[in-house]
Amino acid sequence: MLKDIVLVLALQLVYVPILTLRTIFMVKNMSLLAAFMGFLEALIYVFGLSIVFSGKQSYIVMIVYAAGFGARGFLLEDISSKSWAIGYTTVTVNLQQKNQELIHLLRESGYGVTVYTGEGRDSQRYRLDILTKRNREEELLELIERYEPKAFIISYEPRRFKGGFLVASMKKRVKRKKECHES
């Protein structure tokens, strides 16, 4: 019976990351991967329930199943969704002054930055459009906050993009920067 309890708990803890990935893949229109994750999700679900409903002392296993269901969300869901940040984010930063130091640092850190000059209500404003991988968004926001604490920032997920400064260039630039600092 202890083996069943441990197995049910383990199945529940594996179930959440698969459910999270399936949802992410569905939202990103990655149908084949979403379908595969759905298959795994159903397999784990049916297997777990079959263990719960078999045996003489299934009420204990049912409680563990329910507890595992609650614990998995508490322990894993937030962690898995942040660490698997799939895709890209566009961050728009509005500044009162053109901060060349920030712009240079962002580019040296591997971010694609486009700078626009615009007319605000009272004065000229500067807008930075920055494309980054979702898993680097927090790092980017911290960097901006450090250099421009009063910046107005909007981030959103682009549905589609073509051309421009993409990840290959970002990776090359970061790699070159690391090589320069190591030598």
UniProtKB/Swiss-Prot annotation:
Q: Which UniProt keywords apply?
A: Cell membrane, Membrane, Transmembrane, Transmembrane helix
Q: Name one GO cellular component term.
A: plasma membrane
Superkingdom classification of source: Bacteria
UniProt keyword annotation of Transferase present: no
Transmembrane stretches, by residue range?
5-25, 33-53, 59-79
- Entry keyword annotation includes Membrane: yes
Q: What membrane topology was assigned to this protein in its record? A: Multi-pass membrane protein
Primary site of residence: membrane
Pfam entry (one)? DUF2179
InterPro entries the UniProt entry points to: DUF2179 (IPR019264), DUF5698 (IPR044035), UPF0316 (IPR022930)
Q: Where in the cell is it found?
A: Cell membrane
Please state which protein family the record places this protein in.
Answer: Belongs to the UPF0316 family.
| HAMAP family documented for this protein | UPF0316
The record's NCBIfam families line, in alphabetical order, gives: PRK04164.1-5 (NF003194)
Q: What is the protein's name according to its record?
A: UPF0316 protein GTNG_0803
Organism equals: Geobacillus thermodenitrificans (strain NG80-2)
